[in-house]
Amino acid sequence: MDNANCVGGCKFETRSFQYRRRIPYSLGADPLPPVHPLSLKNLVDIDTDLISSQLYELYDSIILNDSGLERRYAFVQKLEQILKKEFPYKNIKTSLFGSTQSLLASNASDIDLCIITDPPQCAPTTCEVSAAFARNGLKKVVCISTAKVPIVKVWDSELQLSCDCNINKTISTLNTRLMRSYVLCDPRVRPLIVMIKYWAKRRCLNDAAEGGTLTSYTISCMVINFLQKRDPPILPSLQMLPHLQDSSTMTDGLDVSFFDDPDLVHGFGDKNEESLGILFVEFFRFFGYLFDYEHFVLSIRHGTFLSKRAKGWQFQLNNFLCVEEPFHTSRNLANTADEITMKGIQLEFRRVFRLLAYNCNVDDACSQFTFPSLTDTSFMDDYVNELQLEIVPGFSHGRDSSDTSCTESPPEPSHFAWAFDPYNATASPYYNQNINSSIDYSSIYSNDVPAIPPNVPYTFVDPYTYACYINNNSYLPPSYMDFYTWYNSPYPKSSHHFDERHGGDRHEKNLSNSRRYSRNKFHKKKQSSGPFQYYPDAFSFTPTDNNSPPSNSSSSEVVSPVSLHSEPVLSTVQAFKS
């Protein structure tokens, strides 16, 4: 039996929470249609100075003050004295972690406490700790021993504070140190994370245990990765900077080292002059409309995005949003939210962006969400209908009808070139770049492009896969069906559809697999038979020769709206016939 918990036979171990799913199942799991960035309101048309002033005013009113900090330390000392009295031979110490130590706590935040014993094997169980707290007059004692991290929840009626205690989970204190170091790197980090956490709490989106949403730590990691990906970046990756690595930096077999001198990193983001209001608005624009949830993982350890396929997370449960734990890199912090919940959260991101873009009112954006009574079944239906309005980026609701700065149709394509590179998603989606007007680009922007009949061979390059190829010379998709997809096709883009269109013949798919193995040199031995014979350079794609498809395939030219290099371009590339 695990020393940290005791399942069964404990009167404090109870399902005290009434599970209240935050996002209704009736919202459905259908993917949101893509939204052209040019259909969103431009940043220059948003009063970000007004938003900044509102954010700072609200931040000053909710941030943890000195008196609140003193009450927290008094509560921790009280708990430690109780534990030492109840377990005198356990060598118990306590360590604060979480938002209080990382400087991200508000006056309404809970206390997170780690109970440390020496040696760890002599630790009391969560049920024993719960009983000890109850015997000493603490209220609302709850033992949750079956969670991934068993905890004891307790409330002090005198100090009006609640605390979550775990036992010997010291890696949580290291996560707090890392978060605190990031907060001290730039003065904009702390208010931005605090205000986004405040929004999430007001909208009931930061309760993974009860509502099936996200944790506050996951949201903080999303903000840090967002700041690492700004252009120029505001935060570095502290784990990638040179620092001491030895046996002392290993905990439970994990490398928990990082560059922990924020004074030397202070000023890293000075070249980025974006205000708090701009960052607040752009955070919701990015995660509401621009981030590629299907293919990428947020990693603050690497300070960038990682491929789900490269990490092997494309088949994990609840992997719509993937946030890599900075130390335990095989763990997805966001797996507490399923696909329907993440669809609802993405629509909540869009709701905030709409209110900020057209009303510039932070109070409206952070309005309190209140769960209805169990008998009120119409409330959640109305809420789902409200969320579904965010799917269409027309923003006809909640703004002045005379405002024509943003329409459902993007600007005239002859004056703009849109290029979105998922590996460098920080650049503004607005490029005032003249492009060749002699080419008809209307099919890129039109919302009513007729479906391409199955017998027409023209295809469109998938931007994600093409960007992977351009940025990595060794990259080759698992099959050419991933590389070239039907643009605006009513048919599913899957290998099953591929086989059906070829009469169930898998010969061409096997050819694609053989090309992949050849390109990556997985099979060194020459194939003596079969539809494909091994030649090392038979399909040598290089970025300098991106107009040369494999010699045994016919091709046709299409327009690819992707960024090939540092400059956004809209160029013709070769595509295979399907």
UniProtKB/Swiss-Prot annotation:
Role of this protein: Polymerase that creates the 3' poly(A) tail of suc22 mRNA.
Protein name: Poly(A) RNA polymerase cid13
Species this protein is from: Schizosaccharomyces pombe (strain 972 / ATCC 24843) (Fission yeast)
GO biological process terms held by the UniProt record: 3'-UTR-mediated mRNA stabilization; mRNA processing; RNA 3'-end processing
Annotated ranges, domain PAP-associated: 275-330
Subunit composition and interactions: Interacts with pab1.
One of the record's GO cellular component terms: cytoplasm
Biased composition (Basic and acidic residues): 496-510
Cofactor(s) the protein requires to work: Mg(2+); Mn(2+)
Residues binding Mg(2+): 110, 112
Keywords: ATP-binding, Cytoplasm, Magnesium, Manganese, Metal-binding, mRNA processing, Nucleotide-binding, Nucleus, RNA-binding, Transferase
